[in-house]
Amino acid sequence: MKANDIKKGNVVEYNGGIYQIRDIERSSPQGRGGNVRFRFIMYSVPGGVKTDASLDADDNLPDVELLRRLSTFSYKDGEAFVFMDDEDFTPYTLDADVIGTDAGYITDGLTGIYVQVIDDQPVAVQLPQTVTLEVVETPPELKGGTATKRPKPAKLNTGMEIMVPEYITNGERVLVNTTTGEFAGRAD
């Protein structure tokens, strides 16, 4: 798979090891003929050893054959997250360090999660594009401030903080993009 097609959460082969992509930084240096470079921050699967790799947009990283099992978040067992397969009810347990910053998007009963499995071993999760979270703490809206589009900080029910528009109040349910970590709208 070409470097410009790789997304956060993909599992790839790199330097003889298997890695899950956790973060991607894109840069377009001006003095290099417009070649776009990608810096991948990835963790070995299993093991969780961090590795950085910088690649050109046309460089290839072999995709790893894995099963993607549609699952629901069931519960947290100490530092481990337990997901239940939606078809055969197999429980998949992943440590908090494997989940990483995605833990801020996971709430009880969250559906649409794909657990990635290699040789019957869960190695990673891929979250839905957006999740619904509740705002638990945000400053009140300023009177007459609706004409401006100033964002304000909001603490969510998972402990995560994002920037939201001024009209969002405590107790509201909002959509959060799991790729960018940004406000994506009000939830229905």
UniProtKB/Swiss-Prot annotation:
What Pfam families does this protein's entry cite?
Answer: EFP, EFP_N, Elong-fact-P_C
Q: Which intervals of the chain form a coiled coil?
A: none
Alphabetical GO CC annotations of the entry are: cytoplasm
- Which GO terms fall under molecular function for this chain's record? translation elongation factor activity
Matching entries from InterPro entries are given as:
Elong-fact-P_C, NA-bd_OB-fold, Rib_uL2_dom2, Transl_elong_fac_P/YeiP, Transl_elong_KOW-like, Transl_elong_p-like_YeiP, Transl_elong_P/YeiP_cen, Transl_elong_P/YeiP_CS
Q: Which domain of life is it from?
A: Bacteria
Record GO biological process: peptide biosynthetic process
The Swiss-Prot or TrEMBL record describes its family as follows: Belongs to the elongation factor P family.
Record-linked PANTHER family: ELONGATION FACTOR P (PTHR30053), TRANSLATION ELONGATION FACTOR KOW-LIKE DOMAIN-CONTAINING PROTEIN (PTHR30053:SF14)
Q: What is this protein called?
A: Elongation factor P-like protein
